Amino acid sequence: MMFVTGIVLFALAILISVALHECGHMWVARRTGMKVRRYFVGFGPTLWSTRRGETEYGVKAVPLGGFCDIAGMTPVEELDPDERDRAMYKQATWKRVAVLFAGPGMNLAICLVLIYAIALVWGLPNLHPPTRAVIGETGCVAQEVSQGKLEQCTGPGPAALAGIRSGDVVVKVGDTPVSSFDEMAAAVRKSHGSVPIVVERDGTAIVTYVDIESTQRWIPNGQGGELQPATVGAIGVGAARVGPVRYGVFSAMPATFAFTGDLTVEVGKALAALPTKVGALVRAIGGGQRDPQTPISVVGASIIGGDTVDHGLWVAFWFFLAQLNLILATINLLPLLPFDGGHIAVAVFERIRNMVRSARGKVAAAPVNYLKLLPATYVVLVLVVGYMLLTVTADLVNPIRLFQ
């Protein structure tokens, strides 16, 4: 029951985020003298609407977004006589840019508010964990009897028996230098027998011989990344974990901006990698293992939201919503039509072009002909809609689950 409740709550939170995005456009458009014809939440048939002043407000049947209809957003629109002087495309560049940025800006504001609240209540995670092979804990070596499921074991493991402690930094496994925990684990998996391992402890290099223990682990087979059971070496160590840091009312402010900046970099990397994830999504639809690093749709996001609520992980619920708003802001600022960033790029281009013409003693040129940009816009739309359908299908037939 809580899982379904979580799905509904997260879907509602997404809808509110989109509604606030459009509200940002509407509020700034009004403040700068433009006419807002309609403000609707959802698409499709109208369920309810009312008119206040010159704006019609309403709710439509399909709760998958919303829109804010500003008069004269492009020169190709039909305008009523009272709209001609207030048409958006005729306004000063700074006004147009302000209106267009207000939507993504609202999503960014939501992200900042949520991250600030998380910093106060739960603390912020460290996006830059230790890059060295720092040992966090030692223990026995358990067999992975099935994917993600370890059998019970007791007693010290090979690392502990050899004298390796929590806080030690592994720098070499046999003849292989390692600079991260993943590199260390990979080197151990390939080893067997008694292997010299070099660790740094309090600035001193210590060589200790560790008896590598054979065990079963599920690892990628190298052909499409499918996980398969394999016999590998293990020494019974875990990576050092850096817990979240809680902040006060004032210290949380710079921490929020710093964390959001780091998160934006990660979001940018993820967006740049989208084309490389198509194959993994297709394999997931065909019944293969779903890569948790593949992108998700609104459907997948709501399922993850349901998982977080079902297990009482409200911090994950709000953090995921903050991250989603940051993604919405970032995508909408891409300088491609039909995104807000594409319209901003057109407005800035017109401004620079007319400044150059003015410097040459020429009059301002006509606004950009959006009809000539339609082919490029349609290409972007086809790619975006196609990718959305791919992710929705993958989320329906093979969703990413936090707990299974």
From Swiss-Prot:
Species this protein is from: Mycobacterium bovis (strain BCG / Pasteur 1173P2)
Cellular location(s): Cell membrane
Keywords noted in UniProt: Cell membrane, Hydrolase, Membrane, Metal-binding, Metalloprotease, Protease, Transmembrane, Transmembrane helix, Zinc
Membrane topology category: Multi-pass membrane protein
Top EC class, one word: hydrolase
GO cellular-component term (any): plasma membrane
Active site: 22
One example of a Gene Ontology biological process annotation: proteolysis
Record-given protein name: Zinc metalloprotease Rip1
A Pfam entry, by short name: PDZ_6
Function in brief: A probable intramembrane site-2 protease (S2P) that cleaves type-2 transmembrane proteins within their membrane-spanning domains. Cleaves PbpB (PBP3, FtsI); cleavage is inhibited by Wag31-PbpB interaction. Probably also cleaves anti-sigma factors RskA, RslA and RsmA.
